[in-house]
């Protein structure tokens, strides 16, 4: 009988070399013959079979049960079944259930190279590996999957799970989904339509207010009215437009405060770009009120000081144009555009660099070739002409007259077409990707009528501290659970390979 724990001076191997290898891979138990493993000594299981000591064997597996003489591997069980087929036939086939990245990791772990792939699967694997998409924030232009990322779904799940321990969690969650997801229910669609209408009405009122017939007074008249003790708003604004502005501000303030109260996390609320846009859309109004109060408190100030405060008020009023960005909350295209610009900063930087180089070169040529009295007096003045020409805008305010200047203008225009077209194609492909991805994510999480989303909500409702703790313990003791699936009195079915 071979001793499992030989003494330091013993020369008896720790296990017979012809003994079958008992392995457990992710709960799948198999008994592998030594002869089958000896055919592939370079693989992990082949080296494990040839290990001369228990210490060497333990370095090749995740755990070892000396009593059962069983080796445990915390790896993908599906790939292990394909690995068994490899030991039988000598060919490895690609698994469709694993992505190229995960399949390659498993193959590297078990000590298999590309030569182990079967001929029928090798070309497909190599093609998928070459075109395997990488993260958009890397130097990659290959389009990735349009399916929602598991991390994005997990973020939604974590946000919803925060309502489990909150007071009135179910009601707050439904109200939050109603405000955040236009397709969640009929009330959410109505709320979205009303919000879009208020945004458009606010923008229309701001544009109409700039027309001459709606401006009863100029800025100087407003300052004079404040000095006389009257309100500048009463002088400058049309009563109808002023009431419409107050209504829009009340609605925007209601939206911001409601989202803040219903948000699952206050910290995440202030980190979300759309919420910051909502705050910026109402902030100018309240800053204008503060500036108006400051004007009212300084009636004895000089006209120059009042004029400066009046300019500050005008700047605050112009900031209302940022309200148009509120439409991004209700527009998949605008959100996709924002994500595209966020992940295309390299391409945008390259585009600006190309334009800067081209403008500098052709501006210098035009400055040298043209006369000084036709708009090319200085190189900075030529920069304007070069920028307009390279972007193919062509205002026509500055036109070269000499032959050399016209040749430089032709080269500037052709160079602009080539320079702008190259990065634009990459940016457009990324926009198409993020648009499809955003649509897929919305379809996965916003409709409560779908079975997946209902299961998600019900799982969030049913989560308790006990179930969470039980789930945590189950995940931590997954390996022991797999080992206990078969009673000791009932030996596992062994297969020799």
UniProtKB/Swiss-Prot annotation:
Topological domain ranges for the Extracellular compartment: 209-239, 292-309, 368-379, 400-406
| Membrane topology according to the record | Multi-pass membrane protein
Ranges within the bilayer without spanning: 380-391, 392-399
**Which residues lie toward the Cytoplasmic compartment?**
1-186, 263-273, 331-345, 436-497
Which segments show compositional bias classed as Basic and acidic residues?
470-482
Give the main localization category.
Answer: membrane
Tissues expressing this chain: Highly expressed in brain, but not in the other tissues tested.
**Entry superkingdom:** Eukaryota
Motif Selectivity filter boundaries: 392-397
Which residue ranges are recorded for the region named Disordered?
464-497
Q: Assembly and partners?
A: Heterotetramer with KCNB1. Heterotetramer with KCNB2. Does not form homomultimers.
**Domain note:** The transmembrane segment S4 functions as a voltage-sensor and is characterized by a series of positively charged amino acids at every third position. Channel opening and closing is effected by a conformation change that affects the position and orientation of the voltage-sensor paddle formed by S3 and S4 within the membrane. A transmembrane electric field that is positive inside would push the positively charged S4 segment outwards, thereby opening the pore, while a field that is negative inside would pull the S4 segment inwards and close the pore.
Name of the protein this chain belongs to:
Delayed-rectifier potassium channel regulatory subunit KCNS1
**Source organism phylogeny:** Eukaryota, Metazoa, Chordata, Craniata, Vertebrata
């Amino acid at each position: 009988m071979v001793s499992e724990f030989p003494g330091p001076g013993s020369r008896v191997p720790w296990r017979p070399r012809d003994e079958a290898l008992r392995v457990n891979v992710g709960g799948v138990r198999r008994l592998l013959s030594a002869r089958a493993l000896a055919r592939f000594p370079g693989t992990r299981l082949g080296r494990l079979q040839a290990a001369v000591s228990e210490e060497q064997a333990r370095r090749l597996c995740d755990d070892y049960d000396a009593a059962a003489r069983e080796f445990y591997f915390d790896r993908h069980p599906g790939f292990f079944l394909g690995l068994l087929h490899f030991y039988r036939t000598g060919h490895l086939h690609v698994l469709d259930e694993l992505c190229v990245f995960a399949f390659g990791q498993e193959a590297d772990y078990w000590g298999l190279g590309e030569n182990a792939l079967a001929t029928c699967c090798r070309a497909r694997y190599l093609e998928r590996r070459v075109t395997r998409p990488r993260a958009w924030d890397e130097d990659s232009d290959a389009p990735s999957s349009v399916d929602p990322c598991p991390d994005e779904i997990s973020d939604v799940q974590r946000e919803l799970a925060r309502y489990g321990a909150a007071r009135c969690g179910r009601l707050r969650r439904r109200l939050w989904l109603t405000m955040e997801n236009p397709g969640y229910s009929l009330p959410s669609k109505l709320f979205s339509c009303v919000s879009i209408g208020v945004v458009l009405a606010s923008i229309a009122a701001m544009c109409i207010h700039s027309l001459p017939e709606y401006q009863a007074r100029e800025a100087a008249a407003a300052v004079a009215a404040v000095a006389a003790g009257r309100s500048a708003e009463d002088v400058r604004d049309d009563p109808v437009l002023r009431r419409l502005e107050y209504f829009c501000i009340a609605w925007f303030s209601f939206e911001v405060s409601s989202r803040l109260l219903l948000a699952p996390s206050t910290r995440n609320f202030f980190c979300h770009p759309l919420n910051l846009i909502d705050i910026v859309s109402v902030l100018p109004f309240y800053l204008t009120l503060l500036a108006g109060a400051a004007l009212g408190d300084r009636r004895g100030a000089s006209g120059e000081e009042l004029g400066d405060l009046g300019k500050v008020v005008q700047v605050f009023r112009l900031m209302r144009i940022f309200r148009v960005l509120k439409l991004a909350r209700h527009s998949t295209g605008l959100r996709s555009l924002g994500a595209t610009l966020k992940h295309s900063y390299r391409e945008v930087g390259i585009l600006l660099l190309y334009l800067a180089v081209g403008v500098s070169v052709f501006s210098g040529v035009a400055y040298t070739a043209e006369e000084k009295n036709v708009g090319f007096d200085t190189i900075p003045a030529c920069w304007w002409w070069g920028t307009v020409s390279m972007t193919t805008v062509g205002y026509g305010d500055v036109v070269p007259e000499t032959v050399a200047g016209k040749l430089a203008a032709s080269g500037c225009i052709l160079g602009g077409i080539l320079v702008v077209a190259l990065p634009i194609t990459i940016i457009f492909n990324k926009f198409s990707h993020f648009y499809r991805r955003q649509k897929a994510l919305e379809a996965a999480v916003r409709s409560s009528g779908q079975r997946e989303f209902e299961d998600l909500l019900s799982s969030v409702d049913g989560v308790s501290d006990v179930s969470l703790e039980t789930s945590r313990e189950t995940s931590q003791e997954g390996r022991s659970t797999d080992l206990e699936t078969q009673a000791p009195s009932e030996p596992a079915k062994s297969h020799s390979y």
